[in-house]
Amino acid sequence: MNVYQGKSVFGGIAIGHLCVYQKGEQQVTRQKIEDVEAEVKRFQVAREAAQAQLGELYDKAVKEVGEANAAIFEMHQMLLEDEDYQDSVENIIRTQQVNAEYATAVTSDHFSSMFAEMDDDYMKERAADIRDISERVIANLNGENKSKVVTDEPVIILADDLAPSETVQLEKDKVLSFVTVHGSVNSHTAILARTMGIPALVSTEMELTQDLDGKLAVVDGIIHV
């Protein structure tokens, strides 16, 4: 029997089979484009679509976790409205004559790194928010849906990390618990898990491998294992 230590974000015990959730990686390549203004328009259309999607997530979250906790999605909308963020993407498109996906990815890396290097723990967590909104924009540019956890039976989700948008879309009758390799007890994902009453561990000292899928496991949020 293997025992892994993590940080509990919500006490409780869950027993069930593991479901390894691995996000489909967004393959972003740098491509030269000719019509920069058309590419800027592509970005803005994708950004506006992301705004609408976040509005829908906010409405769902209000019902699930209340207005105060749903405010994370309003904050995500504000990040997408941020002029520095938009200017960065548009400037990269115009000056380098590259595709919007690449410009968004570069902007995401820049801003998320900037937040991650801050001393304040709350501000550090905003790095994950920048990555989340950027992934949503890139998914829209590619004509894809942003990843979400889908399962047919009650399971313990095992993931590298979960974004707030993925967490709020979890079906509580299908998720016994979740365990992530990364993440923090101060993250919005952790806050949502507590509010939704889902036993969860984050920053767990283990390696995420596909062969764990289907294994029987016990999550004890009281003793952090």
Regions found by a protein language model. Name each.
Residues 1-225:
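Non-catalytic, soluble scaffold/interaction modules
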